[in-house]
Amino acid sequence: MNIRFYNARILVPSEGHSFQVITGELWVKKNEIIYIGDGLDTERVFEKEPAGMILWDREIDAEKNLLLPGFKNAHTHTAMTFLRSYADDLPLQDWLTKQVFPKEALLTADDIYWLSILGIMEYLTSGITSNFDMYFFPETIAKASIDCGFRTMQVSSFNDFTSSIEEMEEIYHKVNEMSDLTGYVPGFHAEYTTSKEHLKQVAALSEKLHAPVYFHNSETALEVEQCKERYGMTPTRLMEELGMFQYGGGGYHCVYFEDEDFEIFRKRNLTAVTNPASNLKLASGIAPIDRFIKEGINLAIGTDGPASNNCLDKIGRAHV
């Protein structure tokens, strides 16, 4: 489909990390933006067309509207749409072990396919055009995204109870070869669901593939406390000691950080993905965003899954 937006205010990137707003037109040909400008320099576009012109399927007067680049949802579990608003009154550990994990054990690949498509439909209503997903049946999730024309990067949810490191490597190659719309990187669910031996395997695979690693990190005070009891250090320090960050990556939530955790993230150029609405629902706490900014650490925002957030609205999460 060929679409022309005109009379629009358009937010476009400029030098550095800044943006500017221009007034003009935005043209979409099939699935590609082919022009953004004031509409006075379109000859260069027409010159590339075989017929010297473009037949529009739709022309939209966008006066008094602002066109924005698509949002990226930096952390989510899309297919958890089936658990939306489920068990709203429990802290994270009870919520996971008593309510979520038993329900997830019943899911099939076909369930994941249709639940993923349902989630993608919701993403599009708030301008989300790509996501960083973590869930089961990654090849099925990739197929759902491809069928919808949606861009999905996935990270492994590897832990002590599902799959193997060999399967993670196999899926890495399969998903990364499926389409330009899909990708996959090594990772694991969290320190508290993954033994030290398995964590070492993830670090070794990251080294072998030269790939970054992502995981749920320091989401609750209990998680950090128990990790210290097991290993005498925070989850971030443990992963650093295991060589997990040689090729970058990051953590989801990052609510309970100590001074050395900030230093490791800064030194390794890691990304802290905040999930404010999810952390509030599960009474986990509030991430120290001001400290991340002060330290110059990469920051991103995710919705988390719809079960721990109750929606997949990126704008609403940024507002929180």
Describe each model-derived feature in a short phrase.
Residues 2, 23-26, 59, 63, ...:
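Conserved N-terminal beta-strand of ABC nucleotide-binding domains
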Residues 8, 26, 31, 64, ...:
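Divalent metal-coordination and catalytic microenvironments
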Residues 84-149, 169-178:
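Alpha-helical scaffold segments that flank or form the walls of functional sites
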Residues 140-255:
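Metal-coordinating catalytic core of metallo-dependent amide/deamination hydrolases
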Residues 70-74, 131-132, 152-155, 184-188, ...:
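Hydrophobic faces of well-ordered beta-strands that scaffold small-molecule active sites
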Residues 1-48:
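N-terminal metal-binding scaffold of metallo-dependent hydrolase/deaminase domains
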Residues 194, 244-319:
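Active-site-adjacent C-terminal substructures of enzyme catalytic domains
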